[in-house]
Amino acid sequence: MTTARHPRPPEIANASLEEIAARYVARYRDRKADWAAFEDAKVEGYKRAQHRFIGAGGSGKHADVNVVPPRGFTLSIMYVEPGQGNAAHTHEVEEVFFVLQGYLTAFIQDESGRRIDIKLGPWECIACPPGVIHGYVNDSLEPVYFQVMLGKPRPDTMGYADEELYRRRDAHLKEDAR
């Protein structure tokens, strides 16, 4: 006999192992590439696809029923082609970029515009603290796949450093609702 030393959350207190596996396993083959996950993804140079696994990440698409319900963090896989990336932004929580395949240039930036680029390869990562302006670009010759984790189950949408993008940061959600 084995003993669970911690209680299950109320919503799965009486669930079978099969029910738990059905709700808490996510497979890449079942993920849909979302090329409109973020407002800046409409802009050339920022086009990328989010594959949501746990929660919505910084996309704000919290109604996605095809994801594992988030408890303490989110997890997505990003696909970024050469020459693309994302706009400089902040979050209210830590964000991690962990490269799986390919090469990525992550950056951190201060409010004066000073920027430091960090080249990342497979199995390398950067943890971006809350409130620190950051982002990435794929300046290599091949696509890159990397994990993105945010340290909260329902983080706010991206806090773009650019004023116009920030003003429209939720517009992609309104378009999805139509």
Spans of model-derived segments:
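A structural connector/turn signal
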Residues: 75, 85, 94, 115, ...
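Short beta-strand His + acidic residue motifs that chelate non-heme Fe in jelly-roll/DSBH
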Residues: 86-89, 106-108, 128, 134-140, ...
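Short, solvent-exposed loop/turn segments that connect beta-strands within catalytic domains
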Residues: 66, 111-115, 142
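Short, conserved beta-strand element in jelly-roll/cupin
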Residues: 72, 77-82, 90-110, 149-152
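A short, N-terminal "cap"/entry segment at the start of jelly-roll beta-barrel domains
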Residues: 1-71, 164-178
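A short hydrophobic beta-strand segment most commonly corresponding to one strand
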Residues: 96-98, 127, 141-160
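Short acidic-glycine-tyrosine-enriched beta hairpin
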Residues: 110-130
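Conserved short histidine dyad/triad with adjacent acidic residue
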Residues: 56-63, 74-91, 130
